[in-house]
């Protein structure tokens, strides 16, 4: 009797997009949380990529070894820490350019497991994503030029003459923000996995607009990453982080935002609102709110009791 279950699924599709664009989408890790609904965060360390993704009511974390062939427009991600019953899994993308500016995308998913009911179910679950995944990459690639216009990305740094621990603690303890940050009117938070937070937050913009959002956060030692999973009506996606850089005098905290505008929701800002108008609005509102939060963190961390 075989002691393992091994399966491979391959899907191909013709994309009305250049091969180089499609290749960038699956290799530039910044795109994953922004354009893929389950993606929360990914970071690279040499050829190792660490991933965090929504799964059920929680977050799954794993690592893969990435093998890049840029000239061949091919990338392979081999998981290095498979949990039983899976014993191996991988995803490979290959893009073949065509003379008319389109390309053929080929996606190959492989999974091995223990030869058991649980193993076969795990393999089937891994391979079931093939159709959805190649369709999603095609949709993104074919609308890439428009998407670039709809994405607002910026960073706001602030120096704080206090300890990194105090600032990090202020931002980590988001459930205390309604007492500490005026534009946050209510917030409920859970942390069932260490360092993984889910919270529902009510905020008010400078114009008095009320928003309710739901977010997931990954709290790493040097960075707190977030992704909104319950979004305001104007946005298709909103991701970002708080990054901490300790200096001899204190800490520089950088608030990063990447937001994708919904073009069919522009009228929420007025009948004649353009994408450029919405970009300016988001840059102002998101920056104002995050800098307000940082300035309250600054006041907290620079108090003698916390400095």
What are the functions of these language-model segments?
Residues 190, 196-205, 210-213:
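Aromatic/basic-lined ligand-recognition segments
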Residues 47-49, 72-79, 197-199, 221-228:
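Short Pro/Gly-enriched beta-strand edge/turn motifs at strand-loop
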Residues 1-74, 83-88, 288-307:
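Hydrophobic, helix-prone linear segments
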Residues 65-70, 211-221, 267-274:
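Extended Gly/Ser/Thr-rich low-complexity repeat segments
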Residues 23-26, 32, 92-94, 103-105, ...:
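Short, structured motif recognition centered on aromatic/hydrophobic residues
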Residues 3-8, 55-56, 61, 78-137, ...:
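Beta-strand/loop substructures that line and gate deep hydrophobic ligand-binding cavities in soluble
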Residues 19, 44-47, 67-73, 94-104, ...:
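A short, structured loop/turn motif at beta-sheet edges
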Residues 1-46, 131-193, 307:
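Hydrophobic ligand-binding cavity/cleft-lining segments
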């Amino acid at each position: 009797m075989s002691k393992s279950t091994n399966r491979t699924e391959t899907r191909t599709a013709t994309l009305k997009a250049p091969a180089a664009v499609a290749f960038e989408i699956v290799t530039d890790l910044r795109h994953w949380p922004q354009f893929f609904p389950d993606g929360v965060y990914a970071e690279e360390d040499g050829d190792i990529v660490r991933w965090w993704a929504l799964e059920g009511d929680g977050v799954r974390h794993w690592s893969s070894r990435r093998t890049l062939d840029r000239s061949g427009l091919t990338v392979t991600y081999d998981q290095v820490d498979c949990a039983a019953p899976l014993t191996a899994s991988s995803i490979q993308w290959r893009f073949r350019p065509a003379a008319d500016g389109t390309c053929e995308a080929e996606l190959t998913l492989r999974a091995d497991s223990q030869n058991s009911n649980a193993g076969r179910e795990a393999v089937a679950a891994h391979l079931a994503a093939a159709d959805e995944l190649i369709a999603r990459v095609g949709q993104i690639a074919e609308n890439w030029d428009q998407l670039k216009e709809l994405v607002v990305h910026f960073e706001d740094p602030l120096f704080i003459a206090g300890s990194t621990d105090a600032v990090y603690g202020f931002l980590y303890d988001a459930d205390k923000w309604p007492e500490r940050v005026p534009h946050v009117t209510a917030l409920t938070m859970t942390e069932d996995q260490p360092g993984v937070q889910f919270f529902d937050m009510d905020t008010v913009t400078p114009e008095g607009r009320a928003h309710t959002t739901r977010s997931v956060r990954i709290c790493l030692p040097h960075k707190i990453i977030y992704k909104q999973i319950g979004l305001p009506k104007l946005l298709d996606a909103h991701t970002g982080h708080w990054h901490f850089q300790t200096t001899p005098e204190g800490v520089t905290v950088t608030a990063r935002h990447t937001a994708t505008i919904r073009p069919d929701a522009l009228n929420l800002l007025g009948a004649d609102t353009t994408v450029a108008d919405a970009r300016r609005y988001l840059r102002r509102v998101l920056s104002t709110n995050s800098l307000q939060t940082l300035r309250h963190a600054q006041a907290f961390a620079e108090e003698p009791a916390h400095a």
